[in-house]
């Protein structure tokens, strides 16, 4: 065949590819469709583009998702958790992992999973983000992950039913088991509405004026920590990250003010329209234990200075999502020397975390 005949044949082939392979209802796997299209593009470049421009044409074709782990697999996950724990010198317990994965088998398979770690040498954690409104407390009780008379059950049950579309997720430690139950509240809501929900302790309700005075008007998520009996409230703060804003918020747990030098390490990673801010509160006393500022959707090749522990975490924690999600949070607690302050890191593992958070309207 001469060049013109090759051209006609290829054009017909590309039209066929568009109909049969790119069609979203095509029975062929996504990988096959993308690989075919990229191969056809490469052939077209070979026939029609000068050698120096061929790579540019191919680069514009859709790239296939090369991961072999398109869906959550418990055995693969245990292996990945074990290897990451070894790398970070963190505790790992096979029996605990089996109990967690057996209890929440469908949640892990249906949801999106992410890794968690801090700049301290305090282990590895992971979370599943659910896509459906399901009970996550009952299975934990039935499988002895928490006690059936735990004092935090009425509160988290109330928040899980705060709105009809609220969704519960869970955090785990690979050596200790269930750590937190975490609620997406179905959108952004006035802080007061969450505080007056049934079964919220008076110690938490009494914080309304202090939270509002600090500019924390809008709440997005809430969580309970089963081990420390603390609660986490996550707020949307629709303001730029400035020194006065930061120093106002870190006074909640009694943290001394930071300076401009510290702020310059944080600010480049925050968007100007606002940020996610979290508080940790002791339910027994109503005291703020910790606050955190979350920088979201970070480029894995342009992360903040965070120390060797977290740098290793982001390098070695595998992500099988098509779009990696990297999150860093600066966490402040009381204490004059800053020894209780640290940095938190989160990273997508599998299940298309970006899609879940986008569906929630999250700035993440």
Curated annotation (Swiss-Prot):
Keywords: Glycoprotein, Prenyltransferase, Signal, Transferase. Its EC number is 2.5.1.-. Coiled coil: none annotated. Disulfide bonds: none annotated. The keyword Glycoprotein applies. SUPFAM superfamilies: Prenyltransferase-like (SSF143492). Residues 1-22 form the signal peptide. GO terms for molecular function: prenyltransferase activity. It is an enzyme of class 2 (transferase). Glycans are attached at residues 142, 337. Transmembrane segments: none annotated. Belongs to the aromatic prenyltransferase family. The gene is not located within a recognizable secondary metabolic gene cluster. Prenyltransferase that attaches isoprenoid moieties to carbon atoms of aromatic substrates in an enzyme-catalyzed Friedel-Crafts reaction. This is Aromatic prenyltransferase. It comes from Talaromyces marneffei (strain ATCC 18224 / CBS 334.59 / QM 7333) (Penicillium marneffei).
